[in-house]
Amino acid sequence: MTTQVPPSALLPLNPEQLARLQAATTDLTPTQLAWVSGYFWGVLNQQPAALAATPAPAAEMPGITIISASQTGNARRVAEALRDDLLAAKLNVKLVNAGDYKFKQIASEKLLIVVTSTQGEGEPPEEAVALHKFLFSKKAPKLENTAFAVFSLGDSSYEFFCQSGKDFDSKLAELGGERLLDRVDADVEYQAAASEWRARVVDALKSRAPVAAPSQSVATGTVNEIHTSPYSKDAPLAASLSVNQKITGRNSEKDVRHIEIDLGDSGLRYQPGDALGVWYQNDPALVKELVELLWLKGDEPVTVEGKTLPLNEALQWHFELTVNTANIVENYATLTRSETLLPLVGDKAKLQHYAATTPIVDMVRFSPAQLDAEALINLLRPLTPRLYSIASSQAEVENEVHVTVGVVRYDVEGRARAGGASSFLADRVEEEGEVRVFIEHNDNFRLPTNPETPVIMIGPGTGIAPFRAFMQQRAADEAPGKNWLFFGNPHFTEDFLYQVEWQRYVKEGVLTRIDLAWSRDQKEKIYVQDKLREQGAELWRWINDGAHIYVCGDANRMAKDVEQALLEVIAEFGGMDTEAADEFLSELRVERRYQRDVY
């Protein structure tokens, strides 16, 4: 960065302001300067009047565009780190959310980087669905003048590992793009792979990308809004659990908990639509069982991230024990030469099925072997936090955050098993006990900025959580817009989550309509998608009145069934064929009128 000051006549600052700016930035590193540049761009982006008053810059040289397609925040963090690396190398770079990207301009991109995660059964993140559809449609342009690279994040415990990245990579090449680098598919522990890939990208682009002129604003893009907080995924807040209340009935097949966490005077802020990240500890009883099955001792030393820890502590705090993966099964089979597991090696479908139905501890029980402690540690994946849709608004609950947790419980040959994070919150954290948390902001699941806009909320099961936050916010704002909730669960008497609250909102006129689907209260199973079809005419009227549609919950089945029902309603009552209805719903997505938080 140059320290030479342009003539004062060309500056929008007076001498005193310029002196203060120079003093404030003297000791900053290039990466810090890049962040500050992006921060002030974000501040400016929130002030349309100031932005409009700024003279149009001279036509700038084409630079690098990074598209961030994130579901849980990891892809966004990688994209932001790459942006900072490129800015530090004095390269002209723009970072945009996939949901904000004007994808019809993709043909004009010269240097394009895509950082994407995968959700559901190989689908792109919600914010990238429209871009993905466009690239795979007949409207996609040739990209013969575009060089690109793709970094894909995923979880190898799922069958369609990194599928979204594979899709983008193959389609960009098919459209004529030139690969700068081979695609990288990163697993849950992605940091080392991302760091190496970022360095390779910077090296590859240095010879191809224009260096930003000193007078240019190199931070020409940012990811929506700048969130500043001392707490993050890597530096969580030590909060305390204040309420743990079961909100399903005694005879329900589901154990759903309403959890309230006290944030104290931390100043941690969130918005309706955000998620709460929870770092949990594994059950000590599960750790003990696994250690004993392998004939190990809990006090044996192991090395974790350069530190020496007792095996018990390492397993309880640092490694994933409740989710098995095909890679773990394959590696355990190879390591132990298990006669039961070796026949599965090489058969992806069988490995996936075994991993999905057999927890790690039961894999060891069924195929016992003797491993040393370090071999066990090397076999496992690092523990990662779980994300829960926030079920509260700070306009009502202030220094608290609420979540709705479906506790995972099941048996394996008569032995009780449970989900790591859900059982931690439900069973092992005492009242006022410590819970390490952070906020994962989700700018792709937000209430309309206009309080008069109607809202349609579709959230069966624990998918109801963010809509409780929405209603608290709409009530606090005295928003005049209509609100319509679709909720479903097996039984009315046992599974009507937050029933009293919804009844109060209806009585007070905050909740205009509520449609309920109970799948097991009658012979015929009824789901929320059936209620959507049943109310199709009225639903179409709301959509025509500008309503925003929100869907939260299961990505693999519910979200697909709901989307199909919406397409049928649009086609029938909008007088469209299937293709036109799909295009209409895609436009709603681009306009942020159709938003999903699915998992």
Swiss-Prot record:
The keyword Methyltransferase belongs to this UniProt entry's keyword annotation: no
> Domain Flavodoxin-like spans what residues?
64-202
Query: Which processes are annotated in GO (biological process)?
Result: cysteine biosynthetic process; hydrogen sulfide biosynthetic process; sulfate assimilation
Q: What is this protein called?
A: Sulfite reductase [NADPH] flavoprotein alpha-component
Assembly notes: Alpha(8)-beta(8). The alpha component is a flavoprotein, the beta component is a hemoprotein.
What CDD domains does the record point to?
A: SiR
- Which Gene3D superfamilies is this protein grouped with? 3.40.50.360, NADPH-cytochrome p450 Reductase, Chain A, domain 3 (1.20.990.10), Nucleotide-binding domain of ferredoxin-NADP reductase (FNR) module (3.40.50.80), Translation factors (2.40.30.10)
What's the superkingdom here?
Bacteria
**UniProt family annotation:** Belongs to the NADPH-dependent sulphite reductase flavoprotein subunit CysJ family. In the N-terminal section; belongs to the flavodoxin family.
